[in-house]
């Protein structure tokens, strides 16, 4: 029996996808999201915890958080700045955990350490001592922020929780503020990491599809854009004033002030630029290959 989707709220569109640790996950045929059984989502919205953010959780996550802060986390932060269509004077890491990324950005860009901020609702006992590390929610902060990242967070959140986060970001954003989200999206789960759905150990309950994300974000003034070739990240912009003809303009023609900021730590600029460019052309190559194969199949089916 098909069930209703908690993400896009379409009725009877959720098909059984898989079972993990005795929890059933469903796939929405409308918004593509993969979500845990709705009873769990309802219980979480009522205050129950499937996987709490206690010290045992952080003990298992701190190593991964530290590794991300020195590698792909830095690349995602650099990309957010590179893609921004407004000058980045204030940057925020949302759901920052222990604040390792904040510390790394401060080390790489010491002359701009005050530019970077982080916020975390459920911090571990040991966390960053940076003065811009704040315990709380995005809505608690004084804006505006020009850019930011939210890395490995929303897969833990119910649609209602994500909506509250979106409302908070809207409060601290201005026109063209950009937020890059790093999360395992449905294509990533299906084709790259089926084990990403992990209710007990990591608390991953939903893989949000882009159509579902658009329904959630657009209501609050955000435009959602896919990142070419990346099945693990997307960007949202608040009340955007620009529309680019092609995504490549974001990395080939960034705002001069933002490129200058990244070039303060040259490797950060290169990491962001090459990540954007390589995945972009990988996506282009895949599309052209699929087109060529489809054309070949069509021609083979035609009588000579």
Where are these regions (language model features)?
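A short beta-strand-loop micro-motif that forms or neighbors metal/cofactor-
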Residues: 175-184, 225
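Histidine-centered divalent metal-coordination motifs
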Residues: 152, 156, 204
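Short, conserved loop/helix-junction motifs that constitute active-site signature segments
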Residues: 110, 171-174
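Conserved N-terminal segment of class I S-adenosyl-L-methionine
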Residues: 1-151, 163-167, 181, 230-234, ...
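Short, glycine-/aromatic-enriched active-site segment of Class I SAM-dependent methyltransferases
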Residues: 181-206, 211-215
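A SAM-dependent methyltransferase catalytic signature shared across enzymes that methylate proteins
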Residues: 8-14, 210-227
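Short glycine-rich, flexible loops that bind phosphorylated cofactors or substrates
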Residues: 156-157, 188
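Helix-to-beta-strand junctions that scaffold the AdoMet/dcAdoMet cofactor pocket
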Residues: 157-159, 173-175
